[in-house]
Amino acid sequence: MRIKRREFLKASAAVGAVAVASPTLNAFAQTGTGASAMGEAEGKWIPSTCQGCTTWCPVEFLFRMAVRSKYAATQLSKANNGYCCVRGHLMLQQLYDPDRIKTPMKRTNPVKGRKEDPKICPYHMGMKQWDTIADKIMELRKNNETHKYLLMRGRYSDHNSIFYGDLTKMIGSPNNISHSAICAEVEKMGSMATEGFWGYRDYDLDNMKYLIAWACDPLSSNRQIPNAIRKIQGVMDRGKVVAVDPRMNNTASKAQEWLPIKPSEDGALALAMAHVIITKGLWSKEFVGDFKDGKNKFVAGKTVKEEDFEEKLTNGIVKWWNLEVKDRTPKWAAKVTGIDEATIIRVATEFAQAAPACAIWYGPNMQPRGSYAVMCIHALNGLVGASDSEGGLCTGMGSPSSSYPKIDAYQDDVAKAGAKNKKIDQRGTLKFPAMGSAKPGTGVVTNNVADALLAADPYDIKVAIGYFCNFNFSGTDGARWDKALAKVPFFVHCVPMFSEMTYFADIVLPAALHHTEDWAVIRSKANLHGHTSIQQPVVERMFDVKGVETEITWLLAEKLKAKGFENMYNWLYNEYKDPETGKNPTNSLEFALYATKIRSKKCWDPKENAEYKGDKLNGWADFMEKGIVNSPKFKFRQKWEKGFPTETKKFEFYSETLKKGLLAHAEKNKVTVDQVMEATNYEARGELAFIPHYESPKRHGDVKEFPFSLIDMKSRLNREGRSTNATWYHAFKKCDPGDVNQEDVLQINPADAKKLGINEGDMVKVTSVIGSLTVKARLWEGVRPGCVAKCYGQGHFAMGRVSAKDFGKAVARGANFNDIMPADYDRITGATARNGGFTGVKIEKA
């Protein structure tokens, strides 16, 4: 039986009519009497976890009459103190979205392409989809080609260790590819190269007196949004908040001062601030040290003898000054940043005078040369002694978890051999150091997978699975992904919505939603506390959906066992026993539950948490009811006492940590570090490669032909790219400053619009070096002249009838500007470039 796309939509519409219009809500209700008035006293609050952004807030859902009707933050959470942000409410519409994929489906049109109807039809008999997938994997094993299996990950839980990690190894492939390099990897290098921490920072907002929100919007995106919303006014009352961004975001609109910097000139501003702090003698003597004679010898343009300075907890302050900072004056920076000299001097002085109760909270900085920019920014946190100080910033707290069972005894020789092959994303090659944790080849180069697939370099891929990912939409120059996935012979997509990537799937498996339908464990941190929180089903499933990381693993293992490869099933059956009863799992749901119990055991088992200093629970039922375990509060200055996890055990202005990684990468590829810099498109040569230094912007498009810099911004309503089919997303779009409800717009400064003869609401053609898009113009003073800003999220031709203009005909609603942004990278980290105005565009009336 074949179902055309429009017939599939008609079926969805029938469910939607029941969900939206029926007075009895009989798709969900336990009785046919209809819904009575709902009072606050009715129902039960069930804890789970929101994963709409990278905060991962513990939340609760009010369950009334078999319907999840309300959401709020978990009152026991010390990360958000019971507060939540606006995007969480969209979970209600996501759960009951009539356009969700409801049953496993298969492709019947062998031709793949963006404009090709896949002609999907549902599996009606048994579980044939699992037979098909298992057959493809067995074929790889038979031909000793297990390395040609690829798993691509989007949003995930701790259980990704099972599906993304261990399952891939059991099959025999090195190719588990994370989405993280199109998310926020560059910012991690700022703290990694200076203080040895590869991760997101935490902030002591309760005691902070001066906050610079730099290229990020803590009130809308990035991390710990509810905590920032609740506490930013306190920072302003005690001192000052400054926002650095080419566009007035939510934080900038709240802050006492907004610095509309030119795109990609972040490093210049940071270095000029360092110059001011150093020449004025405002650096932290307690943390950095001082001249032996007590006299400041740092004078603009003049070098200093290293032996004259006695450093304490830092490495290379004088070398950094001599090589770079001495010439980076505010006067120089004013010319390249667009921020006047007096403002640079004043803000730098204010920041240092508030130390150590100050911090720079910086964002992704996903620019082609972003690693060195974030090193410059984070160096300021060290220069004033704010790192690991009360009122400043820190690495944050971890949270308890127990280990997953090991796979070693179950991984056979075929799998071991296959897993030793190179990864498909080309990490570790000369042009992609991809230095996660400053070690070559330990990062990921997500967006480059498309090019690797097209070139079959290092080899071709024959079987691919993707879950909670939509790289054809979320990756820059997405047309590459269209061509690449069209080449893959067999692709399975595990998602809740029919996305742009799903168009290329041979089998579509409907995914359970993390927050309301699945079992999982989530760990995160905010507000100086770490936490482990639960995800659990809060309503009975309406559709034939499965938890990807657990249930799909089990169902696939069952089929592989039936076909003669029983290792995977034996691993799951023997090792994932219920830690309370010792019972072996007998089906996919039991496995999901037991895996969650195993991972969280240290949270709820009185024996395992006996020595834990944070929250203590009394049994699994207690964890299900409370939903969270909070860590103790972070203790400051432990690294001051014990040392930083860098090569020198100090905060590094001259990064021996980065130097070690770059030298290792150069040696592996039989070149010099200078040749690495050249191959990866950085300007640094010699010692500059090891210090925070200025790199001029790398821009696609000559300024004369493409005069405007494109600013890619994020909506406070985006839920990991899967919320645009919610009507509330569009109804409240103006909560993103400068945007318009029910519209997708390009923000243009009125002064620029006047020169172009463009009026409010005009349709404009936006052209880059790789293509053009048409979108509605929005005239707004909140975007810097010479820049245009577009919010990521809209422009779907898939996802559903709200998200697309015409879902049946695959007509997009709005424009996805990833389609005209070239595929480029910060190659030290492997991160995709999307920030810093690296794409030049020209604007014309359509």
From Swiss-Prot:
Arsenite binds at residues 155, 179, 200. It holds the Pfam family Molybdopterin. Mo-bis(molybdopterin guanine dinucleotide) binds at residue 183. Predicted to be exported by the Tat system. The position of the signal peptide cleavage has been experimentally proven. It is an enzyme of class 1 (oxidoreductase). Residues 1-29 form the signal peptide. Its EC number is 1.20.99.1. GO terms for molecular function: 4 iron, 4 sulfur cluster binding; metal ion binding; molybdopterin cofactor binding; oxidoreductase activity. Residues 43-99 form the 4Fe-4S Mo/W bis-MGD-type domain. Component of the arsenate respiratory reductase (Arr) complex, which catalyzes the reduction of arsenate (As(V)) to arsenite (As(III)). Can use acetate as the electron donor. ArrA is the arsenate-binding subunit. PANTHER family: TETRATHIONATE REDUCTASE SUBUNIT A (PTHR43742:SF9), TRIMETHYLAMINE-N-OXIDE REDUCTASE (PTHR43742). Belongs to the prokaryotic molybdopterin-containing oxidoreductase family. NCBIfam families: TAT_signal_seq. May also use zinc as a cofactor. This is Arsenate respiratory reductase molybdopterin-containing subunit ArrA. It comes from Chrysiogenes arsenatis. The lineage of its organism: Bacteria, Pseudomonadati, Chrysiogenota, Chrysiogenia, Chrysiogenales.
